[in-house]
Amino acid sequence: LALTSAMVLSLAACGGSSSDTKTSDDSKKASKSDVEYVQDKGTLVVGITDFEPMDYKNDKDEWIGFDADMAKAFAKSLGVDAEFVEIDWDNKVMELDGKTIDCVWNGMTLTDEVTSAMACTSAYCNNAQVVVVPSDKADKYQDKDSLKDLSFAVESGSAGEKAVSGEGYDYTAVSSQSDALMEVASGTSDAAIIDLLMASAMIGGGTSYPD
């Protein structure tokens, strides 16, 4: 598989917690309360998806990656252990509100929907949405107009889905970005829209998707 030069949307990544964002004073109170809650129970429960290179498992079935390592370091600073829970990305706000998880730490895009529903850190990573097609077809697709007749696979609830729906393209929503790549590799979909960070780690020579 290969990237095309058609960048769909520029984005930023963030970590999120607590849905109380009414005012700055309220946010400070909520933050203190949330920290005490986490410290009292001794664990920071982190909501993630399998999203290499941000969050993924090694051969020992341990969660590693840029975000996973940051979450572990943050939990250590609080004097607690980090516990990782795979979530349905569509349900991240519901999981937070129900206290099934304490935070979301998964290369999350700072959208109006996200920042209105939960308190977020400042963005610490620039990202983009990119189109992935079979490498033998990449030269055919270099602008938006060339993509309009393709069928896309995107992660449900992701920035990729927002981008493709905004363009009016035909698409199928799947449960994860890795599933979107599988759709393209199997020929079920013509292209996938995923994060540039994931695409850089998951496709090309030496990966599971070299072609």
Feature roles, as predicted:
Residues 84-95, 139, 156-157, 172-186:
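Short helix-initiation/N-cap motifs at beta->coil->alpha
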Residues 45, 79-81, 98-106, 150, ...:
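Alpha-to-beta junction loops
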Residues 133-151:
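Flexible hinge/capping segments at coil-to-helix
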Residues 26-107:
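Extracytoplasmic small-molecule ligand-binding "clamshell" domains
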Residues 118-131, 147-148, 176:
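Short Pro/Gly-enriched coil loops immediately N-terminal to beta-strands
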Residues 11-27:
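Bacterial lipoprotein signal-peptidase II cleavage site
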Residues 108-116, 163-166, 190-211:
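A ligand-binding cleft/hinge motif common to bilobed small-molecule-binding domains
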Residues 56-60, 71-80, 144, 157-177, ...:
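Ligand-binding cleft/hinge of the Venus flytrap
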